Amino acid sequence: MEEFKGYLELDRSQQQDFLYSLSFQESIYTLAHDHGLNRLILNADSDKKYSLLIVKCLITQMYQQNLLIFSANEPKQNLFFGHNTDLYCRILFEAFTVILEIPFSLRERPFIERKEMVQFLNLRSIHSIFPFLEDKFSHSNYVVDILLPHSIHLEILVQTLRYWVKDASSLHLLRFFLHQYHNWNSFIIPKQSRFFFXKKKKBQRLFFFLYNSKVCEYESIFIFLRNQSVHLRSISSEAFLERIYFYEKMEYFLEVYAKDFQAFFWLFKDLFMHYVRYQGKCILVSKGTSFLMSKWKYYLVNLWQSCFYMWSQPGRVQINQFSNYSLDFLGYLSSVRRNPSMTWSQMLENSFLISLVIKKFDTRVPTIPLIRSLSKAKFSNILGYPISKASWADFSDSNIIDRFGRIYRNLSHYHSGSPKKTSLYKVKYILRLSCVRTLARKHKSKVRSFLKRFGSGLLEEFFMEEEQVLTLNLQKISFTLRRFYGRQIWYLDIFCINDLAKSE
């Protein structure tokens, strides 16, 4: 938040078109460069250096009747005043994202102060969700595994912002730019379609922001209906609804949906349900019956298609009994393990045997997805056989070893919450041998000759076990406390899961 304050020094006359005026401030593009374009500009050719004047001319050109249409098949013609149009589109994309995120960031702080909520930075961690899962999932019966719909027209995404952003000029500029960017056959939106969420990963920050705004709109209504159906109101849900600023929507659904769905509310009385979403996937967990979960599945699919114009196949919503199902979520295979036990109980002179079943939330590290990621990043083939990283062969020896070691430490750090680390040992073997093959490739020697020359202990300090790192950092913790917690420790400093291919 403090970073944005220096870029918001506007006159009162500019307050009406607050966001639109920011589109022509050089400081915004400097901030956009600092956030996402550093690597792009540093690796750019000499003719790709940008200037604010070219950006302003490009914005002005979009409003002209003679709009420029560029061909992706002829990249040499994709020039605007002698500069590469693709570069300026990326700059505009990043700047639009920064500008649209400003009102959301400004609104979040007053909300927290008004609710007197204590700010814990650890709550930002992805791992902060797992203690909640451990506490709630062991008492649940059914889990609904949901893949969110992803085919959304760009116009629908822009219209979603109208409930938050009251600046019509900035919305018109955003709409102009998105349609023009489609005409330029961008690397984000396929030429054959204007529907969002292609699987290419370049410059998707703005589209992720728009898509999450649309999903939050659906979630606000879903949580509202869920709160109407239970006696115990969720404080966090109410805070979430107020935070995303859907007052107009809420008033509408209070009048319409509360009447239309009154006949269905009796089905869900006293139903304890937990909702978690990450990226394009969400899960519903409940203590209810299979019949009730089927009702929720029917409701969700119809809500998406009728109210939000998001087509979803019923097969994307799967209902499973938690005792016989492993949930693939956030890089873990999670399940509820049943541990039976027997105990003797005595009442007066009679003693009898009691059978107990203890449910425990269990997490396992999946092997196949990890090997698939290593294969995608060219550390191994699809079968997990290590290969050399050809693109790193020109780096120094210490740099190569450090890169491989950092990847393994990050993976070990993230998956430290699982007591079963067999998959990590396989990953460690693949990365170590891939590192050796890369070094041997650089020195133009065979792997066996390289190991005889430098020794196998060369890589040990870079592939230190996560448990050893933890012991070095927490030497003052007593042995009893470490034994009590075992090896399952959730690190609350992990904000994202980085793709291995981006480690370069």
From Swiss-Prot:
Single GO BP term: mRNA processing
Instruction: Indicate the principal place this protein occupies in or around the cell.
Output: plastid
* Highest rank taxon of the organism: Eukaryota
- The answer to whether the entry has keyword RNA-binding is yes
Keywords on record: Chloroplast, mRNA processing, Plastid, RNA-binding, tRNA processing
Q: Any idea which GO molecular function terms this record carries?
A: RNA binding
| GO cellular component terms, A-Z | chloroplast
Pfam families from the UniProt entry: Intron_maturas2, MatK_N
Where does this polypeptide localize?
A: Plastid, Chloroplast
Query: What S-S linkages are listed for this chain?
Result: none
Q: Its biological function?
A: Usually encoded in the trnK tRNA gene intron. Probably assists in splicing its own and other chloroplast group II introns.
Similarity comment: family membership: Belongs to the intron maturase 2 family. MatK subfamily.
| Name of the protein | Maturase K
Species in which this protein is naturally found: Impatiens capensis (Spotted jewelweed)
Q: Encoded by which gene?
A: matK
